[in-house]
């Protein structure tokens, strides 16, 4: 089920597609993520731009180990992806993370939790471009 909403953005009206999440495990993961203050900070931080753990921790005052642990959980639940892996001139490797969702709407109706999520099409386009550019 799709629900469409029109929004005004930079003087242009655009249609936003929010998809109802059907999977119970995905619903639980989204609700658990929203209930955790540090995870919501991480999601907010990587919603529009890919960032490293170092960037996320410095922007949000989250302890380094906590940020790694919670980002790993988000990866396992499919709420963020590794957008890019960077190797420094010194040979160190680090990942840049990006959220797969742009917005989440949760409502409770008649003993039923309804979770709607808008996919982050920017990251989907970027991933598809990389996939199709492989020869």
Sequence positions of predicted segments:
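N-terminal leader segment of winged-helix/HTH proteins
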Residues: 1-30, 87-88
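Short, cationic-aromatic polyanion-contact patches
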Residues: 27-36, 52, 83-108
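Amphipathic alpha-helical dimerization/coiled-coil segments
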Residues: 101-135
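Hydrophobic, well-ordered secondary-structure scaffolds
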Residues: 18-25, 43, 53-55, 66
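N-terminal helix-turn-helix DNA-binding core of bacterial DNA-binding proteins
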Residues: 29-62
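Basic amphipathic alpha-helical segments that dock to polyanions
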Residues: 56, 67-74
